[in-house]
């Protein structure tokens, strides 16, 4: 009798925001990076991708992927690499145990939803590919560890490998040509430093002009600064950042985070022709963070920017009133602040020009903090 059952599994996966940046591939096909990187996984209460993976012999249209209600192309090499790798691991289980249903031979139907704007510099591809890989791994009942699964997610989107873990996560660049040692590992769980918070200023929810993939390869090919960055700057920053996290040393964490962001965007500007992901609002956000730190007399906030204009500001819970209060005051009427922000009292006031640049350019804020890795859920998307 043929198996007509529909098998399914769902997971949520988080966004991660790098504090030591990934920029540049040494192998574009396998998504192998030119340097290691390190990120903070953000709470799924605020930013998450929900993905349901199902398979059945009755799915006659072949594999499919629906993202935010729209059919998405799955013919790309990256998605295909993830499917192929996961199927082969399931097939190995089926070969070892003939009583298992032959799920590896059934078409896959993936349905995914983000609760944040896609492709606007909010690391949506990282959460998306991490969720896709984890959902299929749950569906196939694979015994692989998050680090093993990160090898697969990496082939979909480099930074996705870091979204297989919660907390503070390193992506080790590895040295092997086949990429078998280029994977994520846990630097520290969220519970090690749970006080870490992030305020995201969404400067533009529009799709970015130069995609990360093409941008980074232009940098590799044309930037003179790039070699210095991958040879000296990043290895030093990785060591300092791991130390800062281990010691819960926020001033050190903050300085490395800001210097790293500056270094990354300097190599983008040094690309020929230059790439500019940041805009006037981004630069105003930097001035705002500098203003806060200067007026407080210690480093209480750190800015970082990925390949887009959105500013992510890291701070510790104990300084929430200072940071949230200052931005709440400047961004009156902008949505996304959490309950209690209105009562946050900050002694910091930005000058009128800075405040009005921020108010005009920031479309919303997202208030969040460090969080956990993918979570299996009983919430299913059709």
Swiss-Prot record:
(R)-5-diphosphomevalonate binds at residues 22-25, 78, 157-162, 213. GO terms for biological process: isopentenyl diphosphate biosynthetic process, mevalonate pathway; sterol biosynthetic process. The keyword Lipid metabolism applies. Induction: Expression is regulated by the Zn(2)-C6 fungal-type transcription factor FgSR which binds directly to the promoter. GO terms for cellular component: cytosol. It is an enzyme of class 4 (lyase). Its EC number is 4.1.1.33. It catalyses: (R)-5-diphosphomevalonate + ATP = isopentenyl diphosphate + ADP + phosphate + CO2. Signal peptide: none annotated. Keywords: ATP-binding, Lipid biosynthesis, Lipid metabolism, Lyase, Nucleotide-binding, Steroid biosynthesis, Steroid metabolism, Sterol biosynthesis, Sterol metabolism. Pathway: Isoprenoid biosynthesis; isopentenyl diphosphate biosynthesis via mevalonate pathway; isopentenyl diphosphate from (R)-mevalonate: step 3/3. Belongs to the diphosphomevalonate decarboxylase family. Homodimer. PANTHER family: DIPHOSPHOMEVALONATE DECARBOXYLASE (PTHR10977:SF3). This is Diphosphomevalonate decarboxylase ERG19. It comes from Gibberella zeae (strain ATCC MYA-4620 / CBS 123657 / FGSC 9075 / NRRL 31084 / PH-1) (Wheat head blight fungus). The lineage of its organism: Eukaryota, Fungi, Dikarya, Ascomycota, Pezizomycotina. The gene is ERG19.
